[in-house]
Design a protein with these regions (language model features):
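Short amphipathic alpha-helices within nucleic acid-binding modules
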Residues: 16-19, 71, 78-89
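Short beta-strand segments enriched in hydrophobic/aromatic residues
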Residues: 10, 22, 42-44, 77, ...
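Glycine-rich beta-strand-turn "strand-cap" elements at beta-sheet edges
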Residues: 36-66, 92-115
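Active-site-flanking beta-strand signature of metal-NTP-handling nucleotidyl enzymes
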Residues: 2-9, 72-74
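Short, flexible turn/loop "capping" segments at secondary-structure junctions
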Residues: 1-2, 64-68
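Hydrophobic alpha-helical core bundles mediating ligand binding, dimerization, or RNAP-core interactions
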Residues: 22-25, 29
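Glycine-centered tight turns that cap/initiate beta-strands
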Residues: 31-34
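Short, flexible helix/strand-to-coil boundary loops that buttress conserved ligand/catalytic motifs
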Residues: 22, 86-87, 95-98
């Protein structure tokens, strides 16, 4: 299995637009042959610190956003060929609308499963 993880920083005035776009992109990707799973995650919590994790404390809900909201894409597919083919289609279809919503370039991590 091949995976892409993207970290996005969205403009505060574009949150509704980007979340609607995420639904469109996920639906589009899931219809493509070789795509296994697509998840978009909105950062809503943080840990107080490492000791809080060791003590089993609950994460802290974020109550305000300063300048941006962070989202993560987890996208799983059969192999690199699927990634190349579907990624190209996605960029052709969604790039301009997507880019208008972001504060900075997307951070992208690509790789294969270990477990």
């Amino acid at each position: 299995m091949f995976n892409e993880i993207c970290i996005y920083e969205a403009k505060l005035n574009k949150l509704d637009e980007i979340e609607e776009l995420m639904k469109e992109v996920a639906e589009f990707y899931l219809k493509q042959d070789g795509v296994i799973d697509v998840h978009y995650i909105k950062r809503t919590h943080r840990q107080k610190d490492f000791n809080a994790v060791k003590e089993g404390e609950l994460p802290i809900r974020l109550t305000r956003n300063i300048g941006k909201v962070t989202y993560v894409l987890y996208w799983a597919m059969e192999n690199e060929e699927v990634h190349a083919r579907v990624g190209k289609l996605g960029i052709e279809k969604f790039y301009k609308r997507w880019n208008r919503c972001l504060t900075t370039m997307t951070k992208i991590i690509l790789g294969e499963n270990i477990v």
